[in-house]
Regions:
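Transition segment at domain starts
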Residues: 1-17
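Gly-Asp-aromatic-enriched flexible segments
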Residues: 1-3, 32-34, 45, 103-106
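Short secondary-structure junctions
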Residues: 6, 29-34, 84-87
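N-terminal post-signal-peptidase region of extra-cytosolic proteins
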Residues: 6-9, 34-41, 74-76
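Mature extracytoplasmic domains of secretory-pathway proteins
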Residues: 14-65
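Helix-rich interaction surfaces within compact, conserved domain-sized segments
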Residues: 53-106
């Protein structure tokens, strides 16, 4: 577990046989953030009122500086879910420090 990434810039839900892949792109406030992941907001990774929520998090290096272009501060994290895990889910939400993005299941 890390600290929240500054912003979520893109959220894609890709259907695959047997489930889906959640892919979130984010922009960090500093360069060098590593071990970026989608962390479930609930301990058992279950939806609340049909909404499955994740936090886009990463580990900041100790001597991080807010320098560099947005390209050098862009990170991506993904998480695979089965159809069973997606049952009862109407919306997937990914939160960052300053914003959140949602995607409705079709």
């Amino acid at each position: 577990l890390g600290t929240p990434i500054d912003q979520v810039t893109n959220l894609v839900i890709e259907r695959v046989p047997g489930g889906a892949i959640i892919r979130a792109t984010g922009l960090t406030a500093v360069q060098g953030v590593f071990q970026v992941q989608l962390t479930p907001a609930t301990e058992d990774e279950t939806p609340v009122n049909g909404v499955l929520t994740y936090r886009l998090e990463g580990i900041r290096p100790p001597s991080a500086r807010a320098v560099g272009s947005t390209h050098t501060r862009t990170v991506v994290a993904a998480r695979a879910l089965t159809d069973q895990e997606l049952s009862g889910v109407r919306t997937i939400r990914v939160e960052a420090a300053r914003n959140a993005q949602t995607s409705r299941r079709r």
